Amino acid sequence: MSDFNKDDYLNDLPDADELANGQASPDADGADAPSDTGEQLKDDMLKDAAAEQSAGEQASEESAKAAAEATADAASDGDAEGSSLTPLGQAKKEAAEYLEALQRERAEFINYRNRTKKDMDRARQQGIIDVLTAMLPGLDDIDRIREHGEMDDSFKAVAAKIDKTFEKFGVEKFGLKGEDFDPTKHEAILHKPDPEASKATVDTVVEAGYRIGDRVIRAARVVVASPQN
């Protein structure tokens, strides 16, 4: 049996530094390989995502830049057109714009004035119609008194003033015995056969009609003499 040599045994043992650096065991290198591969894949995925994000941001910046350039070009064209005019040309252009605006305002004012006048005339006419309508029963009574000859001179003067007042405001009285019957202005309350009549005529005016211009306020209520069949 050989003698045990302490120094030789100690020299054959690996150093602590070699164990820390992984040089003592070859199996340690094989165990670290899968971990390095996973880290590499993770790094590649992060790089690809960063590249895609950068490409999207670059495309957005390019679109915004193109839109800004288009707006600037349009403004530049307008400024160029204005700057190309001489002072006299610029003054003429402004004068034409002011004239156009003035003409437009004048047309609007004329339309407003005409519309206001029509509204005032319509309101005035409606006021006359309201007064006439309220006085119709009294006017009918005056006509009945005239027909029966029971009106004295003083009352005749008052009645004449009333008639003239309505005439002043455009009120026209119509409905006379013997005139042709017109359903647009006559209201027939009775038809009386007449062997001598060749067409329908007004035989008796029960209540006179009134109109303003072409507008009939009240149709004349009449008895109509009609031809016999």
UniProtKB/Swiss-Prot annotation:
InterPro entries, per the entry: GrpE (IPR000740), GrpE_coiled_coil (IPR013805), GrpE_head (IPR009012)
Function: Participates actively in the response to hyperosmotic and heat shock by preventing the aggregation of stress-denatured proteins, in association with DnaK and GrpE. It is the nucleotide exchange factor for DnaK and may function as a thermosensor. Unfolded proteins bind initially to DnaJ; upon interaction with the DnaJ-bound protein, DnaK hydrolyzes its bound ATP, resulting in the formation of a stable complex. GrpE releases ADP from DnaK; ATP binding to DnaK triggers the release of the substrate protein, thus completing the reaction cycle.
Gene3D superfamilies (alphabetical): 3.90.20.20, Head domain of nucleotide exchange factor GrpE
Keyword Chaperone carried by entry: yes
Start-end of Basic and acidic residues biased regions: 39-50
Top-rank taxon, per record: Bacteria
Keyword tags: Chaperone, Cytoplasm, Stress response
Name of the protein described by the UniProt record: Protein GrpE
Lineage of source species: Bacteria, Bacillati, Actinomycetota, Actinomycetes, Bifidobacteriales
Main location (coarse class): cytoplasm
Bias type Low complexity, positions: 24-36, 65-84
MF terms in GO: adenyl-nucleotide exchange factor activity; protein homodimerization activity; protein-folding chaperone binding; unfolded protein binding
One matching Pfam family: GrpE
Assigned protein family: Belongs to the GrpE family.
Region listing for Disordered, in residue ranges: 1-89
Entry's Gene Ontology cellular component terms: cytoplasm
Source organism: Bifidobacterium animalis subsp. lactis (strain AD011)
Listed GO biological process terms: protein folding
Localisation per UniProt entry: Cytoplasm
Subunit record text: Homodimer.
